Amino acid sequence: FSKGFGLAGLRAGYIITTQDLIRYISKVSNPFMMSELSREMAAAALSDRTYGDSHSGDFIAMKEALRAACGDNLTMACTDDRVPICLLQHRDERLDLQEELMKHGVLCCSGTEFEPMERNSVRLRVPRAEEMGKLLAAIEAVGIAP
């Protein structure tokens, strides 16, 4: 849900159960409790049934371009191309991939934030179309560099 609608970080779900069980569930501290704003965002995203289909072609094309730009030293994990995030890993385990991409102005999340990945990996969002050229140039530069 969150990634497919471009709302990464928003966790939304629901439970269908009995009133008795709801009484117990409501007593549990839930780290994923949604604020009113989050509920409104989730409802708005779910009400637009065309969003995913209308943008999936864009995401597919951009992820294909990213994959083609990776060069010999970068690999892109296999994920559904309709999802606007990807995982990149550099062959050199000593390389801080986030730092290298930041030198080119690309914001991403270091693999060290996700077990068991290391600093030679990053997770990044597919950018808006107008920013894609900058990302591709950075990927090519880092993918070719030893």
Where are these predicted regions, by residue range?
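A short beta-turn/loop motif at secondary-structure boundaries
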Residues: 78-80, 114-117
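Conserved PLP-binding catalytic core of the aspartate aminotransferase-like
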Residues: 60, 73-104, 122, 126-128
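Alpha-helical scaffold elements within enzyme catalytic domains, especially in hydrolases
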Residues: 58, 69, 100, 138-141
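Residue-level detector of anion-binding/catalytic polar loops
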Residues: 107
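PLP-dependent enzyme catalytic core of the Aspartate aminotransferase-like
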Residues: 103-104, 115-146
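Hydrophobic side chains in well-ordered alpha-helices
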Residues: 25, 97-100, 135-138
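Short, acidic/turn-prone active-site loops that include or flank metal/cofactor-
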Residues: 2, 112-115
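PLP-dependent aminotransferase class I/II
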Residues: 1-72, 76-78
